[in-house]
Amino acid sequence: HQCAVVGDKFMRKVESGDKSARRLWGKLLQKRKATGEPYILFKGNTNKSNPAAYKKHGLKVHMTNICSEITLHTDESHSFVCCLSSLNLAKYDEWKGTNLIYDAIWFLDGVLEEFIQKSKGKVGFHNSVRSAEKGRALGLGVLGWHTYLQEKGLPFEGLLSQYETRKIFSQIKIESERASMALAETFGEPLWCVGTGLRNTHLRAIAPTVSNSKLSGNVSPGIEPWAANVFTEQSAKGTFIRKNPTLKKILRKHKLDNEIIWNRILKDGGSIQGIKALDKITLGPHDIPLKEVFKTFKEINQLELVNQAGIRQQYIDQSVSLNLAFPSIATPKWINKVHFEAWKKGIKTLYYTRTESVLRGDIAEQAMDDSCLSCDG
């Protein structure tokens, strides 16, 4: 895998019309559309929003990880450690107002301590242990975001989902920091956190969670929209048909959960937009049309996706595995606009650009990416 590290100075040159910069930027976007890579690390956005502990010690972020959600300091003496877990937003109503977030941070800090104790003195682990001891960075994230919205009858796009984004991720920020302060009082502040009142330099990062989302009730992965409402998936055990469980429940309620409907959705690449029988169905207290709520990844305005990600990034001290999806006919102008807006919104990293695998409603390729198993699960 490859990652392009892009600075603010370069982006301002692109913005001002510098021919050389625009030519290089165009090649980068063309490569992302053709192959899905390279990932992008917006270095300026990342380092401007570094936590107080990093700024105090002059620590900079120079790279990200294989899934683009980790933004931690590295140098000749320090290698970052991924210590991650994810909250299931499909079950948000069950755990909101509880100590789940608080307890999850204590759990992750304990996991990191076990890594430190077991890895001390082992060949090849010196830099990782040193980094973990000094910063104790964690990455609590989420999965099931699109499932949560669909269960509420809310579209991925618009003010309603933006409100939910602020509500949930601000809560995660507040509760995770409360836990880190309690940990610091109990066990002390590590070197890089001295004077901050926190036990951890970082607390939040959102991983892809493709595998973990399946194990958690077949919910949507990470903060990503469903690629399709029904799709074929290949694994070592064979080929399976997976259906959006929330849509299936609604179709059953309206006596439309039948093979004719599902075969039509599959034929249409996982989309329900062409099915007239679904035109008049509305959901939730806002009477949102079913077809708005169950738009697939490729049908969602990618600028809306970026706007939502920009809001979320304000509450995430590391980064987010953020994919973008474009049809093969997407113009260079549109792809540039979406990527440029990501930089302007303060987004730190961009993961894959999805094209044909999303359009087919077939996520077999997506599920089989050789991404990091720790991030994936």
Please report, for each region that a protein language model flagged, where it lies by residue.
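Conserved, charged catalytic cores of large soluble enzymes
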Residues: 1-60, 141-190, 319
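Short coil/turn segments at secondary-structure boundaries
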Residues: 2-6, 39-46, 119-129, 192-196, ...
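Glycine- and acidic
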Residues: 12, 85-96, 120-133, 150-166, ...
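Function-dense linear segments that define catalytic or interfacial modules
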Residues: 34-132, 142-149, 219-245, 250
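Secondary-structure capping and boundary motifs in well-ordered enzyme cores
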Residues: 59, 73-81, 100, 104, ...
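Catalytic alpha/beta core of large soluble enzyme barrels
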Residues: 64-73, 114-118, 204-377
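Internal maturation/activation junctions in enzymes
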Residues: 103-129, 133, 152-209, 262, ...
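Hydrophobic/aromatic-rich, well-ordered segments within soluble, folded domains that form packed cores
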Residues: 137-155, 334-347
